[in-house]
Amino acid sequence: MLEDRWAVAVDRVDVVVVGAGAAGLAAAEQLARARLSVRLLEARPRIGGRVDTRRPPDWPVPVELGAEFVQGKARTLLARVRKARLRVEPTGEKRLTLKDGRLSDVAPSLHGALARVATLHGDVPVEQALEAMERGEKIPAEERALSRFYVEGYYAADVTRASAEAIGVLERASRALHGDEAARIEGGYLGVLEDILSSVEKRAPGALRLSTVVTEVRWSASRVLVESRKATGLALPQLEARAAVITIPLGVLRAPAGAAGAIRFAPRLHDVERAAAAMVQGPLFKLLFRFREAFWRSGTPTAHHARLRGLGFAFLPGGAVPTWWTTAPVESGVLTGWAGGPLAQELSALPAEIRRGRALDSLQKLFGTPRSTLEELLEDELMHDWQADPYARGGYAVTQVGGLGAARVLARPIADTLFFAGEHTDTEGQAGTVHGALETGERAARECLAALRERARAR
């Protein structure tokens, strides 16, 4: 039956890459450099995937609805930043949390909490591992709460289900890269990916096809047939290739047949399905408010305002939107709110108006600014519910209890014909990061090139 389908393919390339996020672009670049014909298919009308830089003309800075920070010394990413002739700017270092009704330095408690997360071991729920660690120890209540707050917010994980071993591996890898040193890319993350795309198109003009929704990947050893349609529903010509690099997010890989964005593989990939089921795409919700002025710094100078000078991050454990950050060192009236894990799921279930209200309530509690003042100062907003996005279905991969080793399975080539990339396939502790995604794209391209060269030698 599969052989019958090849006759109707009207378009042929060496390799088809599914997904034009960081992993897909990195893979396409490597393949194009090797002088292979490449087709890069992207369901969205833009590149970037979970990198979603917006540059609204009436906002004072570029804004990120997706990935935003360069975490520590990520060599692969920083090399690409330099190649694109961009710069990274450290964020505001001051991190405060609401404690006993006032904003206080969170650093001492946060350092202790993060150190504890870095020692997590065992394929048991994070909550269980933390409780075992804390049993008999005199740990301040704030530090105990911050450990859980950090895992749920930063890793988008449910502490009752996520594997302590997996979270510990991620945190130890982050610390090795000085991941607590956050910076932004001047002009936005998208600039790096645009530079990669220009490299692809220089070697493979016309490789990128946007608004192209892949619906089916039929494969046999050494051959792939891809079916796709436009976002409007219009069926596109079938595409035949010698190999495919699949870079769709874990959430899309897990999507049930018939769901928006889901891709059918024929024959089915049973090992991939089982491995994907052992992980989840952690929920994330991100919102940005543009205020007429930086209200947290305005008004008559007081000791309170002095504490907020140079503010980078503010935390409200227990709040509906518990994490906020400024654009420091750039001064503006823009605040970004972030919720991960169960809190993101709660926000996702609410109407937009109620979500906005919950977010403003959180800011009122944090800064003591009356709700009416916040509403009067609010000029614009942007929000993105990543779990409701059919081409993401969440923020980034979280390994559940019983899922250790799943990423290794997801990264494994199939019949030297299907190759997989994306942050969920990372096995070096860099899952959930742009640099991890870039590195997996490069790895999948190397694997694909090696397989194609071996085929050529075997003829």
Regions found by a protein language model. Give the residues of each.
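FAD-dinucleotide binding site
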Residues: M1-R459
